[in-house]
Every structure is written in C-alpha cells, then in structure tokens.
Regions:
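Acidic/His- and Gly-rich active-site-bordering loop/insert found
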Residues: 1-92, 111-118
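A generic structural motif
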Residues: 7, 93, 128, 191-195
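Short, solvent-exposed loop/turn segments at the edges of secondary structure
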Residues: 41, 54, 75, 117, ...
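Fold-independent oxyanion-binding glycine-rich loops
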Residues: 61-63, 84, 126-127, 150, ...
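Acidic/histidine-rich catalytic neighborhood of metal-dependent amide-processing enzymes
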Residues: 95-173
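A short core secondary-structure module
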Residues: 138-139, 195-200
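Flexible glycine/proline-enriched surface loops and loop-helix/loop-strand junctions
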Residues: 167-169, 188-196
Length: 200
C-alpha cells in the first residue's frame, strides 16, 4: 500500500521491491523475471518449479491502482491503516491485498521446499486499471508467451466473496468479464416514425 503504483507513478518500483523480496528468499534470478516495456510500467513473472510435465497454473495480479486524491480520503491513501478491524488504503481490495497474499504464499512454498505437481507461475502486471496505456498481461502474451502459457489461469481479482456476521458467506467464481466500448454515431435523415419507415 505504501508504494504508489497509480498510472502516474507507474508499477516499476513495486515490481522491483517484490523481485528483491523473492530473490532474498532464495528464488533464482531466472525464476523472477522483471520486464519494463515502457518507462514506469514494470512487470514481474515468477515461477515455482514443479515436478511434473503438466502445463503450469498461472496466477494473474495487477500492480497498478486507481489514482487517489488525499483530500478525498479520511486516511492517507498510500499508508496502510487499520480502523475498526478493517484495513484502509488505496489498493487494499483492488488488488494489493491479493498481491501480498500471492507473494507471502510464494515465500512460504519456497521455505517449505514445496514442489507442486506442475509449475506455478505468477504474473504481476502493469496497467490493468483504466487510464493505462500498456496492459502488462497483453504485452506478456505478445512478447513472452512462453512464460505465461498455462493449462489453467486464475485471476484472484475476479469474482469475489462475501462475509456476513464475521463468517464467510459465499465465494463467487467469475468466468468472464464485462468490458466497455465507446461509440460515436451520427445519422442524417429527414425523420419519421417507425410505423412509416423512410426508404433507403
């Protein structure tokens, strides 16, 4: 939360901090690859090697967050704050909480010398939020498809869950995402009524 990774600030610093943390835990440099296809647009691909030949499982996590104007917040947006049992800060929900969880699990799996049946790959990417100019996920597919080709892709940013009365109530699985498209139409016609369409 403390690292500003808005569109204006970029995701490079956060990607480099995560890379340093994973390298300090014993991951090989060849398994923690940093890419910066544009200045400030850092991406990271991490691989935990498995024992089998099955296609990897790929987890996606974007590093960027929506812009935050401090005057719109009751707490500093780039400082993790706990209030009444809730954590507040830009990106806690979307999606630095998930990023932290993925990194913590990569560290734990490494420390426990866990060897999955297939490779686990995590792609930490730039520019998922609106306003970005270079989707890190799309760039990785175009430029390094071999690193992110997988038998199963998990996006913890999709779906969601619900807690009711302090207990987990549901966990939703999302298999698609709505997208938006902007169109501009211009028509010239003498007008009329749908019951009497104008020819042509």
């Amino acid at each position: 939360i403390g690292i500003d990774s808005t569109h204006a600030a970029g995701s490079t610093r956060l990607a480099q901090v995560l890379r340093g943390r994973l390298l300090s835990e014993g991951y090989a440099p060849a398994d923690v690859l940093f890419f910066e296809p544009q200045p400030g647009k850092g991406n990271l691909v991490v691989r935990l090697h498995g024992s089998g030949r099955a296609p990897p499982v790929l987890y996606l996590a974007h590093l960027d967050v929506v812009e935050a104007r401090p005057e719109d917040w009751s707490v500093p947006p780039f400082q993790l704050t706990e209030r009444d049992g809730d954590y507040l800060g830009r990106g806690v929900v979307d999606m630095k909480g998930e990023v932290a969880s993925l990194v913590a699990n990569l560290i734990r799996l490494r420390r426990e010398q866990y060897r999955p049946a297939r490779d686990l790959v995590v792609a930490f990417t730039s520019d998922e939020e609106s306003g970005g100019t270079l989707s890190g996920a799309e760039w990785l597919l175009a430029e390094h498809r071999d690193l992110v080709t997988a038998g199963l892709v998990v996006n913890p940013d999709g779906g969601g869950g619900e807690i009711v009365g302090g207990a987990r109530s549901s966990l939703r699985l999302q298999t698609g995402e709505k997208v938006y498209a902007s169109f501009r139409f211009e028509a010239t016609s003498p007008g009329g009524h749908s019951s009497l369409p104008v020819p042509g």
